[in-house]
A protein has these predicted regions:
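Well-ordered mid-protein domain cores that form the structural environment of catalytic cofactors
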Residues: 73, 91, 103-113, 146-162
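Short, surface-exposed loop/turn microsegments at beta-strand edges and helix-strand junctions
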Residues: 57-65, 74-83, 94-97, 115-129
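Non-catalytic DNA-recognition/assembly elements of restriction-modification systems
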Residues: 1-54, 184-261
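A short glycine-rich beta-alpha junction/loop motif
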Residues: 124-132, 164-189
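Short, flexible loop/turn elements at secondary-structure junctions
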Residues: 72, 101, 107-108, 138, ...
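A short beta-sheet element
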Residues: 95, 99, 103-147
Length: 261
């Protein structure tokens, strides 16, 4: 059984025993962080925002910009699994994920954070309306702040401010209330340098992954984008029952590629 002590001065502040005295790790961490914190997250940010929800027209990668969800932004190859929004009708400059932004989930993926690499912005990748963007002021170390927010204590802090029963959510204002611990400048610089190196390694890993994918396709002598996958031949239709389109004629590019391989 886990127990913890509650100081009398904490009770005097609110003049009652309330629900916040339940024995949760986040309460212990929060009390420690607040003793070593001078500012909330909003103090270090020029902007904390999420974009509005608009009508979207999905298309193929050749005619669209990447549209990333919370799960896509942390994937090794986000452009492989994401959807693509029409370049002609759906481009939203405000939704583009800029290099150095800290991302966190607004609904569902609360506490899941990531730091935007440069290739997101180069691809004009847009983030969904369920992603909260945290823009750190230039004079502060975004690598250090990201490292704290992505730590166990940081993730629990998000959930302390989250609300909602059936579908938990957190707002931009709530995110701005998170306390950020105060450390020495030397320690912050050390953490920031390590995070910057990790971002460089991630970008290099992404580039190498694309190179290996292209080598495999080249070795197989197949250009997926140029082949007529997803087509149904006339002979298949004529041989079907009553010479009609059957349910199994649905376009499955993956199945066609598998048969080709």
């Amino acid at each position: 059984m886990k127990i913890r002590l509650v100081q009398y001065r904490d009770i005097i502040d609110c003049m009652r025993f309330d629900g916040s005295y339940h024995n949760a790790d986040v309460n212990v961490y929060d009390s420690v962080i607040r003793k070593h914190s001078q500012h909330q997250l909003s103090h270090f940010c020029s902007e904390i925002f999420s974009t509005g929800r608009n009508k979207r027209t999905y298309t193929t990668p050749d005619f669209g910009y990447p549209y990333l969800s919370n799960s896509d932004v942390i994937a090794a190859d986000p452009f492989m699994s994401c959807k693509y929004c029409s370049r002609k009708y759906d481009f939203d400059d405000k939704a583009v994920l800029r290099e150095g932004m800290i991302l966190t989930g607004r609904v569902g993926a609360i506490g899941q954070t990531s730091l935007v690499p440069s290739y997101f912005e180069k691809a004009k990748a847009m983030g969904s309306d369920n992603i909260i963007r945290i823009v750190i002021k230039p004079e502060y170390r975004k690598g250090f702040i990201y490292a704290y927010l992505s730590s166990k204590i940081g993730r629990l802090s998000f959930w302390k401010y989250a609300t909602g029963g059936v579908q938990p959510f957190i707002t931009e204002t709530m995110v701005g209330l998170l306390p950020i611990p105060q450390f020495s400048q030397a320690f912050q610089k050390e953490i920031d340098n390590l995070i910057q190196k990790s971002i460089t390694l991630r970008e290099n890993a992404f580039n190498k992954l694309k190179e290996t994918q292209n080598l495999i396709l080249s070795e197989l002598s197949v250009n997926i984008s140029k082949r007529n996958f997803g087509k149904v031949s006339i002979s298949d239709i004529l041989q079907s029952h009553n010479s009609r389109f059957e349910a199994n004629f649905h376009i499955s590019e993956g199945a066609d590629i598998e048969r080709y391989l």
